[in-house]
Amino acid sequence: WFAPSRRYDFLAPETRYQLDGERSRHAIDPILEVFGESKVTFYLVGEMVGWYPELPEKISSAGHEVGFHCHIHRRLDDAKEIKKDLIASAGWIQKYKVRGYRAPMINTIEEVYPLLAKHNFLYSSSQYAPAGIAVKKGDVWEIPVSTLSLLNTPTEFNAPRYMNLKLVSGGEFPYGSSFTSGLFRKTVYNIIEREFKAGRSPVIFLHPYEIVTPK
């Protein structure tokens, strides 16, 4: 709710909590109501689970999957920092049998996969790649956020593989990103329909503030 720069680890923990202003707590019920019977994955920030421990329980009780995003939101491209985050959130990860991971900013490193395996994760969704791609990384599957190949379909999927000039100039349209769907809503909707008709299941993500605005 309060991280337009996509990171806020430079702020004191109490300041981060004050800035949230319990918006995350008040938003969860309206979000669950929006999705209704449609099932989704909620990738939670561990720090927020500490503030509002009822969040994963509400999500799980509503029949949705609880995933892990990070413990404190910032760029995570260092193995030591990833390990620290996994340990910091280990309690609720184990309690809710969390099996899915999504790196902040959809940007990770290859070293993440053995670390996830040690914490019993089954999959990550931390790269960008064409819909239908799934890559086995040791004991962990990488199920990327979806792109549309406008040129040649890529054949190598090694992290980091995030939304940048290299990805776009290489002919991939990252329609699974909420940034893209916010700018090109009708185009993205049409792409998703085409993917479904072709038998593929797109992976897309949205942030809470893109779904509801808490009062």
Language-model-derived ranges and their functions:
Residues F173-P174, S178-K186:
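Double-stranded beta-helix
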Residues W1-A159, F184-K215:
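Catalytic alpha-helical scaffold of carbohydrate-active enzymes acting on polysaccharides/glycoconjugates
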Residues L167-E172:
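Active-site-proximal loop/helix segment associated with metal-binding centers of metalloenzymes
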